[in-house]
């Protein structure tokens, strides 16, 4: 049949922040924050990045603070 998917186990994504023992997500650390932003400048969801809910909330706050302070763009430069 034409619309079937092949079965296979997906590898669980690892929380980058927890794996590297990062306790405080600083809004000034733009190199870290850029890992969690798409090419268009949007914050990537948990299902893509693999971060925990707690760390995703911290990331979102840090990214928004960084944008307001002018360290990161709101949209990508095309």
UniProtKB/Swiss-Prot annotation:
Keyword Transmembrane helix: no
Record Pfam families: Ribosomal_S18
A GO molecular-function annotation: small ribosomal subunit rRNA binding
PROSITE patterns (UniProt xref): RIBOSOMAL_S18
Disulfide bond residue pairs: none
GO cellular component terms listed in the entry, alphabetical order: cytosolic small ribosomal subunit
SUPFAM superfamilies, per database record: Ribosomal protein S18
Record's keyword terms, sorted: Ribonucleoprotein, Ribosomal protein, RNA-binding, rRNA-binding
Gene Ontology terms: biological process: translation
Keyword rRNA processing annotated: no
Oligomer and partners: Part of the 30S ribosomal subunit. Forms a tight heterodimer with protein bS6.
Family, similarity comment: Belongs to the bacterial ribosomal protein bS18 family.
PANTHER family in the record: 30S RIBOSOMAL PROTEIN S18 (PTHR13479), SMALL RIBOSOMAL SUBUNIT PROTEIN BS18M (PTHR13479:SF40)
NCBIfam families documented for this protein: S18
Function per UniProt: Binds as a heterodimer with protein bS6 to the central domain of the 16S rRNA, where it helps stabilize the platform of the 30S subunit.
Listed name of the protein: Small ribosomal subunit protein bS18
């Amino acid at each position: 049949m034409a619309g079937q998917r092949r079965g296979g186990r997906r590898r669980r994504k690892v929380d980058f922040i927890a794996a590297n023992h990062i306790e405080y997500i600083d809004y000034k650390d733009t190199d870290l924050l850029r890992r969690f932003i798409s090419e268009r400048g949007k914050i990537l969801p948990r299902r893509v990045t693999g971060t925990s809910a707690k760390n995703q909330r911290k990331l979102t706050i840090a990214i928004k603070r960084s944008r307001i302070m002018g360290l990161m763009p709101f949209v990508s430069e095309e």
